[in-house]
Amino acid sequence: MTTARIPVDELTEEQAKDELARLAQEIGRHDRLYYSEDAPEVSDAEYDALRRRNLAIEQAFPNLIRADSPSKRIGAPAVEKFEKVRHKVPMLSLDNAFTDDDVVDFVARVRRFLKMEPHAPIAMTAEPKIDGLSLSIRYENGRLVSAATRGDGQVGENVTANARAVADIPNVLSGDFPEILEVRGEVYMTHRDFLALNERQRAEGKQTYVNPRNTAAGSLRQLDASITAARPLKFFAYAWGEVSEMPSQTQMGMVEALKSYGFRTNKLMCLCETARELLEHYHAIEERRATLGYDIDGVVYKVNDLALQQRLGYVSRSPRWAIAHKFAAEKAFTILRDIDIQVGRTGALTPVARLEPVTVGGVVVTNATLHNAEEIERLGIKIGDTVQVQRAGDVIPQILGYAEDRRPADAKEFVFPSVCPCELKTPVVRDSTAGGGEGVVRRCSGEFACPFQRIEHLRLFVSRRAFDIEGLGEKQIEFFFRDPDLPVKSPADIFTLAERDAQNIKKLKDKEGWGTVSAGNLFAAIEAKRTIPLDRMIYGLGIRHVGERTAVTLARGYGSWKAFHDSALAIAGGDLSAREEMDALEDIGDAVIDAIATYFAEEHNCRLVEALAAQVNVLEAERPVADSPVAGKTIVFTGALERMSRDEAKDMAERLGAKVAGSVSSKTDLVVAGPGAGSKLKKAAELGIEVIDEDMWFQRIGA
């Protein structure tokens, strides 16, 4: 089971660390796609679920909080094509509420923090949450001098020229304005303008856009401001950054002041005094959502009194005095035209619904994942049914069910294939459960012979966590796999590309989508990865159950590629002593060993591995020191470490043969405590466990 599927309260400390690393990477990727590339791949609900899981794990394992934790980060770094601008006042994001109870809890938290009576009225504003691109505009003496996107909340992109081209953004303020004023709000596009823009695109034979939000964001972030000027962008003002003299001491008063300066503000903003009033306004806006003419994805509540906002302050990446109450995912009905089968890297067959195109929340949906045969059976759907789909952003959404009264007489039941859809038509087998029964996952038994699996294996091989070959992504792998002149059918083929290209009459640089520079850069990037750490080599093989962390464990356990390779072959041949040696490694169990044995028992895999090993230089891993003063001991680090980070401390201890735990127990041998050590220090004293400080730790290990 991957750590992503394990409930938070069932995670071990090692699993929690791996999961936090995975979440930091995944959330960071989605932040970059959303904030920097205007191309989100998941819905708000899915993204929020990732952040909630990250926060829950951090609360359960506070000692594992990473320096790059998403809970400390807002947005994504500014991209390089725009000049970077540091916000004088950070552009923070908001915590989210998803249910009415969440809103009631938010209001109660505010009252408790302010030491108010449980039912005392507290004025809060409620306004629609615009689904657009956040922008900060700076005015000095009433004149627009700069504009920047949110970026990561600290540093954004300079889009001043583009902001001047937005009709709703005044170049000169009206009325009695402060000398310095940073106005913040959302750039968006109305539904009517979006549809008209797509009509023009079609008329000119150009590609149409996906939804108003991405189109607005992409339009503002053009290097050519004339393109921005040609797009019908609008702007709602709702907040501020640096202000030389506050025109009001309330949230509502500040927004009214922004309106007097010449900005468009939202007419649906109102004042409420209780959670009930907030929820009533939320549901009223939700009912009007479809008729507003622009996209919103929730309602934002803010404490109205700015002095109270100041008292409430901030928690990590968000203010205590505000929250965004998100709408539930949007739904729509459409026709299920067909069901196709996709094959993943491990051979898993996933059914995908092909739908009659339907617009859900501004996105044209044509596909939906069905997960497995059991899900199709559970839903009871047939080809030809009218199905209800729930939007999941701009990727494959979810089917919720079907309309029984609309089922046609010729609705066709889907029969899950017994053979792989690849040209080999290899048999499909079902996974086994821990109890020996049949699992829900069906797999192609063709392994590397299956072209679909080979492509997915190649994609893993060049991925960031494996060989990390720059310029060789999913599209390029697909290209080379199908290319008749420079075919790449195995990892080893990647390292012979330049040599084969030199011998070919038709060069890569002359092919569509390539050129002299891009081809040269690719060959150089490949050459740079001929020397590779052992753990990345092992991970890049794509063995089932051998993830990034397991690959590190195997690398440290065996030290060299030859030692690991020889052991794997021996295990595949039934050598029990080799199996016992691998089983003795920390966190390596039967599932991993069986997967390695299966992999290396396949002659085709062995040939691929040998060919790859002949092309690369695999670095030896630094093996744990067996005779160090802390070898074999379980160590806990707690408190603030001054000479090393927590990760450095853990890595150092593990290299010395120790096991690092996150909590103190009777199995703990040593606690290394820095300033601020709390409950763990107390627990160590209760259990009579040795406690030393950081300086003593370095003395003990002789560093």
Swiss-Prot record:
It holds the Pfam family HHH_2. Zn(2+) binds at residues 420, 422, 444, 450. NAD(+) binds at residues 44-48, 93-94, 127, 150, 186, 302, 326. The active site is at 129 (n6-amp-lysine intermediate). One of its GO terms (cellular component) is cytosol. GO terms for biological process: DNA repair; DNA replication. It catalyses: NAD(+) + (deoxyribonucleotide)n-3'-hydroxyl + 5'-phospho-(deoxyribonucleotide)m = (deoxyribonucleotide)n+m + AMP + beta-nicotinamide D-nucleotide. Keywords: DNA damage, DNA repair, DNA replication, Ligase, Magnesium, Manganese, Metal-binding, NAD, Zinc. InterPro entries: BRCT_dom (IPR001357), BRCT_dom_sf (IPR036420), DisA/LigA_HHH (IPR041663), DNA_ligase (IPR001679), DNA_ligase_AS (IPR018239), DNA_ligase_CS (IPR033136), DNAligase_adenylation (IPR013839), DNAligase_N (IPR013840). Its EC number is 6.5.1.2. It comes from the Bacteria. Belongs to the NAD-dependent DNA ligase family. LigA subfamily. DNA ligase that catalyzes the formation of phosphodiester linkages between 5'-phosphoryl and 3'-hydroxyl groups in double-stranded DNA using NAD as a coenzyme and as the energy source for the reaction. It is essential for DNA replication and repair of damaged DNA. This is DNA ligase. The gene is ligA.
